[in-house]
Structures are given as structure tokens and as C-alpha cells.
Amino acid sequence: MIIYRDLISHDEMFSDIYKIREVADGLCLEVEGKMVSRTEGNIDDSLIGGNASAEGPEGEGTESTVITGVDIVMNHHLQETSFTKEAYKKYIKDYMKSIKGKLEEQRPERVKPFMTGAAEQIKHILANFKNYQFFIGENMNPDGMVALLDYREDGVTPYMIFFKDGLEMEKC
């Protein structure tokens, strides 16, 4: 399994269990997820290692809740955040500088294609700004990558967009 981590915050963003494809001439990775529902808070008696008490009503004190969301977000503990268009422009400008700096250190051959492609991709993001939900890694580092969540034309299938050069891969 390959875990994709944010190059800046080192937060886990997604893994290779999803359908991943390169978009925007290899600048971004598009990761397709699905809507899932999970029950949380319900404790299975077999995990306790004892018998259920014969006293009192069954299940007293434990309430279960069903949480519905996008599997990528839930599995990797991504945190939703929000931006105005102006705030996103400021964030993305600083983020691009950070990634450019990392690329200059680690992969200088990627600097020019990244900066050229990123400018085009940012125009596309800003043109479709109202369609996106924004997610950051579990540690909520404001300097880290902000992943974009959108839905396919069917309105049901979620997908997320990540800047490929802002990710590091870790084999597990």
C-alpha cells in the first residue's frame, strides 16, 4: 500500500486504495471516492471480553450515531475548512512559493513545469470556486495542502484533487 502525505505538514492525505488518475498534464492527482455511512459509538460486547450484564436494559449508556461522508475524508481524518475567493488566492500564492522552494531543493527539474501548470490550474480552480469544498490534513496545519472536493456530473460520485508535487509517497 502507498500512503500519500502532504509534503509540508506530513499529514496523511489518501492512499492507493482509491481510483487515482493524473489530470492537468500530470500536475494534479484526481482521487475518486464514494459516499459511505458508518456507525460510531456502538460498542460490541465481544470487544469487552465479558458477558453483557443481566441487569438493566440492553445497551444502556451507549448511543450509536450514523455518520455519512466521503470515504477519503473519513478514512484519512481530513478536516473541512472554508475559504472566500480572496482568502484562497492569498493561501494558494503562499502555498505555491512553499512547494517551489521544496522542489528547488529536491527536484529542480520539476520547478518550471510546476509553476507553469499551477498558474493554469489555479485559474481553473478560481473559475469553478463555488463547486469546491476544501479539506486540510488532520493536524490542520494552515501552511499545508488544501485538497479540493467536487462531485462528478452525476452529482453523486465525489472526487478530490491534490497537487502531485505537494505530496510525498510512503510505502507501507
UniProtKB/Swiss-Prot annotation:
Protein name: Translationally-controlled tumor protein
Species assigned in the record: Bos taurus (Bovine)
Pfam families (UniProt xref): TCTP
Protein location: Cytoplasm
PANTHER family: TRANSLATIONALLY CONTROLLED TUMOR PROTEIN-RELATED, TRANSLATIONALLY-CONTROLLED TUMOR PROTEIN
Modified residues (Phosphoserine): S46, S53, S64
Presence of the UniProt keyword Calcium in the record: yes
TCTP domain residues: 1-172
Origin superkingdom: Eukaryota
InterPro entries per record: Mss4-like_sf (IPR011057), Mss4/transl-control_tumour (IPR011323), TCTP (IPR034737), Translation_control_tumour_CS (IPR018103), Translational_control_tumour_p (IPR018105)
Subunit structure: Homodimer. Interacts with STEAP3. Interacts with TSC22D1; interaction results in the destabilization of TSC22D1 protein.
Top-level taxonomy: Eukaryota, Metazoa, Chordata, Craniata, Vertebrata
Family, per entry: Belongs to the TCTP family.
Keywords: Calcium, Cytoplasm, Phosphoprotein
Biological role: Involved in calcium binding and microtubule stabilization. Acts as a negative regulator of TSC22D1-mediated apoptosis, via interaction with and destabilization of TSC22D1 protein.
GO molecular function: calcium ion binding
GO cellular component: cytoplasm; cytoplasmic microtubule; extracellular space; multivesicular body; spindle pole
Annotated segments matching region Required for reduction of TSC22D1 protein stability: 70-172
